[in-house]
Design a protein with these regions (language model features):
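Catalytic-site neighborhoods of secreted/periplasmic enzymes
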Residues: 1-45, 132, 202-205, 238
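Histidine-centered active-site microenvironments of extracellular/periplasmic hydrolases
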Residues: 16, 107-157, 164, 212, ...
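Loop/turn elements at helix/coil->beta-strand transitions in domains of secreted/extracellular proteins
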Residues: 1-3, 52-59, 114-120, 143, ...
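A short beta-strand-to-alpha-helix junction
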Residues: 33-38, 86-101, 135-143, 153-170, ...
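C-terminal cap/loop subdomain of S1 sulfatases and analogous C-terminal strand-loop tails that border
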Residues: 28, 128-131, 154, 166-169, ...
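Short, solvent-exposed turn/loop segments enriched in Gly/Ser/Thr/Pro and often Arg
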Residues: 4-14, 62-68, 122-130, 134-135, ...
Length: 294
């Protein structure tokens, strides 16, 4: 049994196989976006139903938190009364609100006696930079992948291995005893050897408003490649023409080709493309070999 709650941009969740859902959400509206803000009850009811039917379950909790509207409960907002910027105070309270709901969900798993037999993955879609979801730089694309599975995963922190969101599906399938199909990209994150063998990671950044559903290259802004200490950001010559959102949001900030030494310059302040043309060419060749639109 599978449940989707929260944000979903691809029509109705049942079209991709969810057995249960809160309905379509559209972009910034819909009943499903009430999850977390109003109640966690739809998730708790679903878990109860799965237990009653003695079936394994999958829950996708995608709350519209800490997204706008920034309307945190007063009990949380009061904790940040000393923050001078009212907008920042509200945002901090929104983050704590999200944190609360995640804690409530974890507590519910314990209450139902399934916490030790449930793999929990916490993901985010952008990094910590202002308007970070649009940046091809590290403070935009570095996001948390936190896993919790008592008895199966030992607590640790790893900031060095190359991991991508495409690894989530093969990880969940393997954990559930399902062999991922050979055509599925990504690696099983529970297999440390497989993760360590990954030498290259590719990233792509698209326009906020999709230009074409069938031709993804028309919406492309940047292509990036990371291998070893090197990272190349290749800006598309004729990107989609949309108005930047300010704060650098999908706004070109550098040269067409930017090469960074992430070991010596983790904040990507020095473009070394002209000093190392051979590295640029190597990474461009890798990108072109990876980017094949079917």
């Amino acid at each position: 049994m599978t449940l989707h709650t929260g944000k979903y941009w691809m029509g109705h969740p049942n079209q991709v196989g969810f057995t249960d859902d809160m309905g379509p959400t559209g972009r910034h509206g819909g009943k499903a976006l009430s999850i977390g803000r109003k109640s966690m009850k739809p998730i708790y009811d679903f878990i109860d139903k799965a237990q009653q039917q003695e079936k394994p379950f999958f829950v996708w909790y995608a709350p519209f938190l800490p997204h706008t509207p920034h309307n945190p409960p007063d009990r949380l907002l009061r904790k940040y009364a000393e923050v001078k910027n009212p907008g920042n105070a509200k945002y901090l309270a929104m983050i704590e609100w999200l944190d609360e709901t995640c804690g409530e969900l974890m507590s519910q798993l314990k209450k139902k006696g399934v916490a030790d037999n449930t793999l929990v993955l916490y993901l985010a879609d952008n990094g910590w930079n202002e308007y970070g979801k649009a940046h091809p730089y590290e403070n935009g694309v570095r996001t948390p992948v936190i896993a919790h599975w008592p008895g199966k995963i030992k607590p640790r922190k790893d900031e060095h291995q190359l991991v991508s969101n495409i690894d989530v599906v093969p990880t969940i399938l393997t954990a559930a005893g399902v062999k991922p199909p050979p055509s599925l990209p990504g690696v099983n994150l529970l297999n440390q050897q497989a993760v360590a063998q990954r030498e290259t990671l590719f990233l792509s950044n698209f326009a906020h408003n999709m230009v074409s559903a069938t031709e993804p290259e028309k919406s492309l802004w940047t292509q990036s490649c990371i291998t070893g200490k090197w990272k190349l950001v290749a800006w598309i010559k004729n990107p989609p023409k949309i108005k930047p959102w300010g704060g650098g949001h999908r706004k070109k900030t550098g040269a067409d080709l930017e090469l960074f030494d992430l070991h010596a310059d983790p904040h990507e302040t020095k473009n070394l493309a002209q000093a190392h043309p051979e590295v640029v060419q190597d990474l461009l060749t890798r990108i072109n070999g990876w980017w094949k639109v079917d």
